[in-house]
Curated annotation (Swiss-Prot):
Co-factor remark: Binds 2 copper ions per subunit.
An annotated GO BP: removal of superoxide radicals
Protein name as it appears in the record: Copper chaperone for superoxide dismutase, chloroplastic
Gene of this entry: CCS
Primary residence: plastid
HMA domain: residues covered: 89-152
Keywords attached to this entry: Chaperone, Chloroplast, Copper, Metal-binding, Plastid, Transit peptide
Subcellular localization: Plastid, Chloroplast
Pfam annotation, one family: Sod_Cu
Cofactor section: Cu(2+)
Length: 312
């Protein structure tokens, strides 16, 4: 009898053990398949695939950037400026002094010879040329002037996607003159373009600073702008260096990750005599909102009667 009970117990234990083994095997298989999923480190970085993020001021906060990734973004800005790397595609709008269909053809033909131009639209009635491409603004303006026609930048970016898609800071002398343009490409990326004259030859540090207070020039603009959720060994507003040639002129074109144009309005851009920004600063200008595409078809300034072609 005892032998019979032992045999019965052993026989019933076999299916149970098999069931436990099956469950364990299923669990291990599931764990194994989860482990085979790509880790975050193997996914494309923001520098190679610009993922859309919620607009500034929305309920969701943008994910914090790992220190190394943010540092790389800052390094990429300087590298792009030094090597003349192509900028991201952006819609840019110009007002061009066109009077006939021949003008339209001349403008289109000129742009079609350039690399980095994806599409061009010409509105003869409004004298407007819209260019989708990755060339700096100055290059496109020079191209328009080469057709023998006056041209003015009137808009950048896409105001349908952003509350503020473009901004500008103007340096009006008496020694240093220049303009800095900022345009939002997407919520993770902005373009910074600058042209300066009147600088001493050599390298100059420059940055986006916290305040737009110019009562004491660059000295009263505060620290380098750095939002609280930005993690890097360098502040987000650090724009690296400008290198002025023998004539005191400098140009800069690069993209910068995590920079949101809407958050920069009312702050300032400051220039320094030294590369490390150890001096009080030599010039500064307030960052102001600039027109987006389709927002500025005005040809006459109502305040002084100056036409767009007469303005500097």
């Amino acid at each position: 009898m005892v032998g019979f009970l032992r045999a019965l117990t052993a026989a019933s234990a076999v299916p149970a053990a098999a069931a436990v083994a099956a469950v364990a095997l299923s669990t291990n298989s599931s764990s194994s398949s989860r482990l085979r999923l790509p880790s975050p480190a193997s996914l494309p970085s923001l520098s190679s695939a610009y993922a859309a993020a919620p607009a500034s001021g929305s309920a969701r906060k943008p994910n914090a950037v790992p220190p190394m990734a943010a540092a790389a973004a800052t390094a990429d800005l300087s590298a792009a400026a030094d090597k003349g790397a192509a900028l991201p595609e952006l819609m840019t709008e110009f007002m061009v002094d066109m009077k006939c269909d021949g003008c339209v053809t001349a403008v289109k033909n000129k742009f079609q010879t350039l690399e980095g131009i994806k599409n061009i639209e010409v509105d003869l009635n409004n004298q407007v040329v819209r260019v989708l491409g990755s060339l700096p603004v100055n290059t496109m303006l020079d191209t328009l002037h080469q057709t023998g026609r006056d041209a003015r930048l009137i808009g950048q970016g896409n105001p349908n996607d952003f509350l503020v898609s473009a901004a500008v800071a103007e340096f009006k002398g008496p020694v240093i003159f220049g303009v800095v343009r900022l345009a939002q490409v997407n919520m993770e990326l902005a373009i910074v373009e600058a042209t300066f004259s009147g600088l001493s030859p050599g390298k100059h540090g420059w940055s986006i600073n916290e305040f737009g207070d110019l009562t004491r020039g660059a000295e009263s603009t505060g620290k380098v702008y750095n939002p609280s959720d930005y993690r890097s060994n360098k502040p987000l507003g650090d724009l690296g260096t400008l290198e002025a040639g023998e004539k005191g002129e400098a140009q800069f074109s690069a993209s910068k990750e995590k920079l949101k144009v809407v958050d920069l309005i009312g702050r300032s851009i400051a220039l320094y005599a030294t590369e490390d920004r150890s001096d009080p600063g030599i010039a500064a200008a307030v960052i102001a909102r600039s027109a987006g595409v389709g927002e500025n078809y005005k040809k006459l300034c109502t305040c002084d009667g100056v036409t767009i072609w007469e303005s500097s």
